[in-house]
Amino acid sequence: MRIKKMFVGLKNVILNPKKSVKMWRATVMWKRAVAEADKKRSMDGHRYFVIWDAAQHKLISITYDIYKGRGDSYQYLRARGAFKRPLSREELKELCFYYTGSQWRAKGCSAEVREEKLIEWQKFYLKQKV
C-alpha cells in the first residue's frame, strides 16, 4: 500500500511538476507559519490563529487579544480594514488554517484537525495566483 502511494505521488510529480512545486511551497509556508504561531504562543501564552494575508501574500499568525500598536492583533488589523466584518473567536477559528492553545486551557489543533487544516490550506493556495 505504501509503495502504491509512493508511485502515485511520483506519477503526479512527473505529470504536473508546476502543481507539485506549488504544493511543496504551500506545505513549507504552512509549516513555517505554524512554527511561528507556536513560538509566539510559548512566549506570551495567548492563542494564535494562522491566516492568509492577501496584502503580503503570505501566512501570518495573529491573536484575538487586544494589543496597543501590535500588528499581529486581530483588533489592530480589523481597525485598519483587513477584515470586512467583525468575527468572533469561533468564526476566526473556522476560517484560519491553524490555531494554537492558550494559557487559559483553550485547546489547540489536534492531529486530525491539523491534517485537515493543512489540506484546506493547500487547496486554497493552489487556487491563488501567487
Predicted segment positions?
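Low-complexity intrinsically disordered segments
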Residues: R105-V130
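Eukaryotic phosphotyrosine signaling hubs
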Residues: M6-N12, K84, E120-Q128
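Short glycine-rich, low-complexity/disordered patches
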Residues: S42-Q56, V130
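Basic, mixed-charge low-complexity alpha-helical segments
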Residues: K4-R32
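A short, charged, amphipathic alpha-helix used as a generic interaction element across diverse proteins
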Residues: R25-H46, L87-C96, R114
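Acidic, low-complexity, intrinsically disordered interaction modules
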Residues: A54-V113
